[in-house]
Amino acid sequence: ALQAGSRVPAMLNFSPGPAAIDAARRAAELKLVITSRQFVEKGRLQPLIGALAPSCTILYLEDVRSEIGPLAKLLALLGGIAPLAMSRLRFGRQGSADDEAVVLFTSGSEGLPKGVSLSHAAIESNRQQISSVIDFSREDVVLNALPLFHAFGLTAGCLLPLYSGVRQMLYPSPLHYRIVPEIAYDVNATILFGTDTFLAGYARMAHPYDFYSVRYIFAGAEAVKAETRRLYAEKFGLRILEGYGTTETAPARSINTPMANRPGSVGRALPGIETRLEKVAGIEEGGKLLVRGSNVMRGYYRAEAPGVLEPPVDGWYDTGDIVTLDDGFITISGRAKRFAKVGGEMVSLAAIETLAGEFWPHHATAAAAGPHERKGEEIGLVTERPDADLAEFQ
C-alpha cells in the first residue's frame, strides 16, 4: 500500500533502544512512524515513542481504522480487483524496477545502524535466483516467525512466497518454541525459515509429528550447529538447508539445495551472482568475499550524512567475511575483523567459538583478542560453563 502511493517503507527494529532508532531515523530521513497503540503497550515502547515524537509524526493504526469510510472501502475493493489500474488512476506515476522499494537497517554491531536501500529489482532478482534452485509451488505453505524488520524475515520469509503465489503463515515471535511447531502442524506447513537458535528451540519442544508435512527447512543468519542438524535428522527425519546472505544482498547470496547440500558450508552462490576473493595478509587459505549482482543494494544511508545514498563501488559489495571455496561451496571462516594474529598466525575467533560450542553445546561462549608482549595478540575465551577446562580442547 505504501509503495503504491510512492512511499518507501523503512522497517525499524524496535529492540536496540532510542539511540540506535534515532540514528536510523536520521540516516533515512524518516518523517512518519506507523505503529499500534496495543503493540507499544505490550512491548513497553513508550520511551521509544517519546524519543521519536519530536522529529516524527506518530500514526496509530487504531486511529486510522476509525477514519475509514464507505468510499475508502469501495476504493480498496476495486484496488483488490484491478490493482494496477487503480494504482495508476489514484497515483498517476508508474514506478520503475530501479526505484527504492524498502529501507532496512543493519544491526549496528560495528557502529551506528546504517540504512540499506533495496530496489524492487533487487528483491525480485533474489526471488528469481532462489526459485531457480528451490522448487517452490502453489501447493506449499510457508511458516515464517522471523521478524519483518530483518531481511531474512521480510524478503525471504514473506515477500518470496507472496510474489510467488505461495501460501504463507506469519507468526509474530520466533521465541515461542512450543507454539511455532504446533502452528506448523495445524497449517500443514511445508517450508520453515529460521536461525540455528530458533530451530534448536523448536526441536526441543516439538512433538516428533509436528513437522510431518515439512519438506524444507532453511536456516541463515548464524552457523547451524552439528547438534541441531543431528536433532532434526533423528527426531523429524529432516535436513536443514543452510544459506548465507545479508541485508545488502536482499538477502540471499548462496544456499544449500536438496540436490547440492554440503553440511558445514553455506552452499553455492545463487545464479547471477558474481563472486571474487581478495587476499588478506596472514590468511593463506581463502580470502575476503566480494559479490556483485542484480540483487545487491542501491547503497547505504548513514546518520552522519542523512539522506545521501552511498552506492557500492562498481557494484561490488564487500561482505567483510573470510571464506573458502571448494567445488563452488562457500565455507565461512569468520569476519575479517574477528581474526587475531597470534605469533604471526591468523586465528579465527569464530572457529574457536564453534569448537567451544561442540564441547559445551548448552553453554554460551565468546572469544576475544587482546595484546600480548611476545605473540602480538592472545585469545581469551569467556563461557557460561562453570567447570570449563581448556584441557578439553587438547
Question: Model-flagged regions — what are they?
Answer:
Residues 61, 73-81, 166, 189-194, ...:
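Gly/Ser/Thr-rich phosphate-binding loop
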Residues 268-272, 281-313, 345-347:
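Conserved ATP/PPi-binding loop(s) of AMP-dependent carboxylate-activating enzymes
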Residues 2, 33, 100, 106-109, ...:
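Conserved S/T- and glycine-rich ATP-binding loop of Class I adenylate-forming
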Residues 4-77, 90, 188, 195, ...:
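Structural core segment of the AMP-binding/adenylate-forming
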Residues 58-105, 112, 132-141:
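Conserved pre-ATP/AMP-binding loop-to-beta segment of ANL
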